[in-house]
Amino acid sequence: KGKRISLGLRGQSDWGVYPRLLLKHVFGITPKNADIRHMTPGALTQQLIDGVTDAVVIPIGAEPNMKEFLIPGLVRRLEATGKKMCYLGVTKEDIDKLNKKFQATWIHVNLKPNTLPHQSKPLGIGVNRAYAVVHPTFSDEKAYKVVMAIAKIAPKMKELHALWRAWSPGLMTCGLSEENTHPGAVKAFKELGWWGQTKKCSPMTYPKG
């Protein structure tokens, strides 16, 4: 409280929406007791570099096994300045409180030291699962073909593009269940022999109402 906090735009889920929910409902931090600013990711990073804000939010990408991490370019910009970065983590109790409030399924994860630049100590973070399946309006045949097409090109894309580095069959199936996945997609996953991996993750759900 009482600090300058720079977040992403109000319409950006990971950069703006979720951090505001965490600040308000877990820490009691609101615009009434702190200087909360919403701006583009590039702008908030520059504010931290210039020393005109006290804290910023920086989402990172990961896969279900938490072995491959996608460090955003904005973190690399901060790293390039040579300035020391101080990470502010969250506890499992913090994330549990947020989940209870919004009927959500955020996950608490402890990052090992040196997962992120200048991270010398373990860091607790809240993980928001990116969840995607074939749209329910697709026919069974189209849903099947979409999954099969991705399964075919993904291994090569993993070698060609940094964003695909975190891809794995586990990434495609984490959070899926018979109830939330298109039947055509389920058929494809079963033929690929990947459906059994859904047991490694709890099914993705959304708040009711």
Functional labels for PLM-detected ranges:
Residues 27-28, 100-104, 193, 203-206:
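Glycine-centered secondary-structure boundary/capping sites
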Residues 60-82, 87, 129, 138-209:
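An extracytoplasmic/periplasmic, membrane-proximal ligand-sensing/linker region
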